[in-house]
Amino acid sequence: MLEAHPWPGNVDRDVLARCIDECFTCAQTCTSCADACLSEKDMVVELRKCIRLNLDCADICETTGRVLIRQTEYDAPLTKAQLQACREACATCAEECERHRDMEHCSICAEACRRCQEACDALLAAMK
């Protein structure tokens, strides 16, 4: 869809497309991880912080992906601030999930968060 968009943009579309994809993938993975944490019967109380961060990260990633898709007359400072918030949410969520890496869903989620964080960093660098 980015290639079909008539707005020329001023950022590498491959870097942009990767970031959009990673944001939506991370949002889905974090939502699924939160749900999986809720199924850990004897550990739900201990996983409250992880669940909360998963859901916060999912919402922020979803919003970031939607902001990035809109190309026409984008506001660079707003977009950069959103990317910064997303990379921070991903870093925080990954750190928490890594504490529970013995649970496969948390390990997978941490990896998705790190990929999204890296994609946000790459796009921020391309926007400078």
Predicted regions, residues:
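Amphipathic alpha-helical hairpins
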Residues: 1-128
